[in-house]
């Protein structure tokens, strides 16, 4: 924003520059003073009493280039046009030729009135100025010089000028400070008011007897009503505001003993007055003694309560001290320590012994059970018998009831005890089958079954008797089946007594029994046609023992472990291995949850940084707008900064 835009505002709205920056760029058409039509030219810049000189442009052919700048402080340009102000606001440019011997030779000079240049409503003026001769000499062609002049306002120097004004009016707070300082220098009432905080003392209860003497009261009043101890309102405000409420002062007759004694000698007081004074002194001393004890004993008491700092042999700790009717005993921390020592964690109480014994007994049982199987032999054998009986009962339920074990293979595969049991079973089965055949022959009435009684004729049997006999036969067959089942159940139990207790051998025996059953299939003992009414044994749904369920479980578990191992191997192969020098090595060892937490933290920090960057950008934008409005000349400075001219 230039002053040309604000030309219509009038001189009242013009701003006053504090500095001027002069940049000497170049010159042309200079007279040659050196050999070969050259010159070693330099320029001198002067405003008021300050001078600056540029560097020497050696052997220039009448067109030296300097591009050097100098800054001068200006007086107020808008003041009235007096002679000193006009001389201080004139810019003088002098071009000289440097001579090796003697004085430098004059090439030309130019003068610029800065007030007129500022009134031209432009902050920056760049133009060519013609060089002239010295005043009083004939003008010649001396060439031109190009100068860039820029007016500036430094706010710091302007504020310094404002602060240095002597006729500036003081604010009321400054006047108040001056008054307070003057009072402190002249009077000593502030110190007196700080020493004596209040003029209305609180009288102690022992001073009631002193109220009879009116003369003494008047003397005390006159003592405190002296003008040297009175407060002025200013000193009172200074002493009361920064401090808290002062404590009350207890006045005793003993404090004014010497003053009253002197006055008593001067006035020749009676003997009654001296007796009163002696009574007052004794009462004051008696009054101060309990106060001293009250102030001293609580300190010791407080020290004694802090963790038992005193030893047990201390006389004060042993004695029962009575302070204001309260007995203080020093052995309370010891009682607390005794209570702590009698806690169940440290004391060997019977409950603690019982708990420890229980824990140790359970640990011993848990430790001995796998190591010493022989100690609990009775219990383990009973459990094994029950388990084996349940297994064999399941086997017998799954096998058919009419199984004969009479083959040689079965005898070879079994132990001698099992062989005897098997032979007994075959004999019993033969007897039962013969009984069945005889009963069936009786029921059906066929003659070919009864071979022994061929010649004896059978008596005729009615249909009712046949039905009754069939029912009886069915009942007998059911009873025989019930008796036969527990016998077969007991056979493997007896065989297991002699066999080993290894579960794998049990599985082998069961497999052998299954193979024996498959080899020796049961044959019908007698081809006798049966009616549905006389069928004794129902066919079982599972004539063959079911397959062992442990085998597929083992295979499934082995397959699962194999798949897990293969998956782990694949994952290890797919995982990329990082070297310790790689920065990714620090993150390769982290778990999934740790990586998620790390990402969230990084995201939070990035958001905070983005917020800070946004705030800085907004601040810079606002600052740039402010600079453009107030001092746009900063933005007009060219990128190439000129050299500084040397001060002369």
Curated annotation (Swiss-Prot):
Modified residues (Phosphoserine): 205, 209, 237, 304, 319, 343, 345, 347, 349, 360-361, 386, 438
Compartment annotation: Recycling endosome; Cytoplasmic vesicle
Keywords, ordered alphabetically: Cytoplasmic vesicle, Endosome, Phosphoprotein, Protein transport, Transport
BP GO terms, sorted: negative regulation of adiponectin secretion; protein transport; regulated exocytosis
Spans annotated as Necessary for interaction with RAB4A and RAB11A, subcellular location and endosomal recycling: 584-648
Molecular function (Gene Ontology), one example: small GTPase binding
CDD domains: C2_Rab11-FIP_classI (cd08682)
UniProt cross-references to PANTHER family, sorted A to Z: RAB11 FAMILY-INTERACTING PROTEIN 1 (PTHR15746:SF22), RAB11-RELATED (PTHR15746)
Known function: A Rab11 effector protein involved in the endosomal recycling process. Also involved in controlling membrane trafficking along the phagocytic pathway and in phagocytosis. Interaction with RAB14 may function in the process of neurite formation.
Protein name from the UniProt record: Rab11 family-interacting protein 1
Organism: Rattus norvegicus (Rat)
